[in-house]
Swiss-Prot record:
UniProt organism field: Psychromonas ingrahamii (strain DSM 17664 / CCUG 51855 / 37)
Region (Amidoligase domain): 1-266
Pathway field: Pyrimidine metabolism; CTP biosynthesis via de novo pathway; CTP from UDP: step 2/2
InterPro entries in alphabetical order: Class_I_gatase-like, CTP_synthase, CTP_synthase_N, GATASE, GATase1_CTP_Synthase, P-loop_NTPase
Gene3D superfamilies on file: 3.40.50.880, P-loop containing nucleotide triphosphate hydrolases
Subunit record text: Homotetramer.
Protein name (database record): CTP synthase
Gene: pyrG
Length: 545
């Protein structure tokens, strides 16, 4: 079957939840037996989000094939079974880089390079490549209609609609209906103007998804349909809800999926959303609440740890527990001491880069180890646990990472200079390599040690997990750490790199070099997060000795 396209644009304001809407629609269509993928087009000039500040952009989501992508791809993978790849996310910077590289090679035969047709053609080619092999490709365009940066993308999707035919394309526009409490009514004018702007660019939306705090009266729906040139049934209300996992059922109840399949002429069964009903039921029926202390560097923006936040919630769902995350700035631990960690049921130190707040993270790992509090370290969270153990248990008082102290005389963590990539080829890096695109990144094989906590949690001896790091445990000093009691329970494919460590004389102290949060989903959870939340419940209820 020829791929069908659903283009999702946004208007009025940013951060309306286009990614959630796209993911929810994809979940319904997948539940109807269709093969669905989702693309995210980002109008910013950066080649990818890999070197962008998490405070500005949120987390960098890593795919199996090692792409550093927008956090919306995390939403997509949590909603559908399709795994995202490098083809599912590209930016203006990536498009221009490729066009300029083609120009330098002479691919354009001396033509004058212009936004139309060269940039718009490149965008279309990437959209088609990303959707190839799937029944439906939902394409989310970042930003807001009217932004200068978005114009080449809007022109590209307009042209693509003409090329593939109107029966193979749907334009879905997400807008805001502000509710004025003083007047007691929703205002439709911003939506009308947003659609007017979109139509001025040659795109007539087929579906309007309207965000609102309240229900939309029928007369307002009629008005929106009339002034925006869509049918009344194509005006979909996306009301604020207390759980994003209720949205698939909310959209299905309004017939959004039926509009799409009829437009595309597809014959497919009704959607079975029983798995999502189960997720919503698990959220509503919890018997415990645990507090997880997340000690990090970017705590002022929770989206910097979006996948970790969601994975913790998923772990809670599978343990009938609601999870409350207490964000703790690691610098505050340095200034105020570990007393601010009191009262938490478990401690998590997530990934990060840079020296700021590093000693606070080390103190958090020490506090968890000494006080027998469940600890999960991720990436840098494993490295600080190694440093803390080396200093305070193994007797390496000057232990540190060369990331933070280049001339450290006891470097228990150092730069990886050589490793096997996802294809089995050897990759090499030096201290002089660029920051962008030079990490050990993507899914890697890990061997688990039988009898370990992680082996029991995963239930298998080999796993694949996603990485994003430059530094690793120094194997030259590893024997000293192991003699002091540290246990390596996970090794890389060639068994040269430490992937997981545990402290055996502790109720639950586990740290991984990889990022387990990237593969956690609300329907399945993740072994490490399920185990971590269970340990938090056990600690809270005094089940640990």
């Amino acid at each position: 079957m020829t791929t069908k396209y659903i283009f999702v644009t946004g208007g009025v304001v940013s951060s309306l939840g286009k990614g959630i809407a796209a993911g929810s629609l994809a979940a319904i269509l997948e539940a109807r037996g269709l093969d669905v993928t989702i693309l995210k087009l980002d109008p910013y000039i950066n080649v990818d989000p890999g070197t962008m500040s998490p405070i500005q952009h949120g987390e960098v989501f890593v795919t199996d094939d090692g792409a550093e992508t927008d956090l919306d791809l995390g939403h997509y993978e949590r909603y559908i079974r399709t795994r995202m790849t490098a083809r599912n996310n590209f930016t203006t910077g990536r498009v221009y880089s490729e066009v300029m590289a083609k120009e330098r090679r002479g691919d354009y035969l001396g033509a004058t390079i212009q936004v139309i047709p060269h940039i718009t053609n490149e965008i279309q080619e990437r959209i088609v490549a990303g959707g190839k092999g799937h029944d439906i490709a939902i394409v989310e365009l970042g930003g807001t209609v009217g932004d200068i940066e978005s114009q080449p993308f809007l022109e590209a999707i307009r042209q693509l609609g003409l090329k593939v035919g109107r029966d193979s394309v749907i334009y879905m526009h997400l807008t805001l209906l502000p509710y004025l409490k003083t007047a007691g009514e929703v205002k439709t004018k911003p939506t009308q103007h947003s659609v007017k702007e979109l139509r001025s660019l040659g795109i007539q939306p087929d579906i309007l998804v309207c965000r609102s705090e309240v229900n939309i009266p029928i007369n307002e729906r009629v008005k929106i349909a009339l002034f925006c040139n869509v049918t009344e049934k194509s005006v979909i209300l996306l009301r604020d809800v207390d759980s994003i996992y209720k949205i698939p059922a909310l959209l299905k109840a309004q017939g959004l999926d039926e509009i799409c399949v009829k437009r595309f002429g597809l014959d497919c069964p009704e959607a079975d959303l029983s798995e999502w009903a189960q997720v919503v039921s698990e959220e509503a029926n919890t018997s415990n609440e645990v507090i997880i202390g997340m000690v990090g560097k970017y705590t002022e923006l929770p989206d910097a740890y979006k996948s970790v936040n969601e994975a913790l919630k998923h772990g809670g769902l599978k343990n009938a527990a609601s999870v409350k995350i207490k964000y703790i700035d690691s610098q505050d631990v340095e200034v105020r001491g570990v007393s601010i960690l009191e009262g938490v049921d478990a401690i998590l130190v997530p990934g990060g880069f840079g020296e700021r707040g590093i000693e606070g993270k080390i103190l958090a790992a020490q506090y968890a180890r000494v006080n027998k509090i469940p600890y999960l370290g991720i990436c840098l969270g494993m490295q600080v646990a190694i440093i803390e153990f080396a200093r305070n248990v193994a007797g390496l008082k000057n232990a540190h990472s060369t990331e933070f102290e280049a001339n450290c005389d006891q470097p228990v963590v150092g730069l990886i200079t050589e490793w096997l990539d996802k294809t089995g080829e050897v990759e090499q890096r030096t201290e002089n390599s660029d920051l962008g695109g030079t990490m050990r990144v993507g899914a890697q094989l890990c061997h688990l040690k039988k009898g370990s906590k992680v082996f029991d949690m995963y239930g298998t001896k080999e796993i694949f997990e996603r990485h994003r790091h430059r530094y690793e445990v120094n194997n030259n000093l590893l024997p000293i750490l192991e003699k002091a009691g540290l246990v390596v329970t996970g090794l890389s494919e060639d068994k040269k790199l430490v992937e997981i460590i545990e402290i055996p004389n502790h109720p639950w102290f586990v740290a991984s070099q990889f990022h387990p949060e990237f593969t956690s989903t609300p329907r399945d959870g993740h072994p490490l997060f399920k185990g971590f939340i269970k340990s938090a419940i056990d600690h809270q209820q005094g089940r640990f000795e």
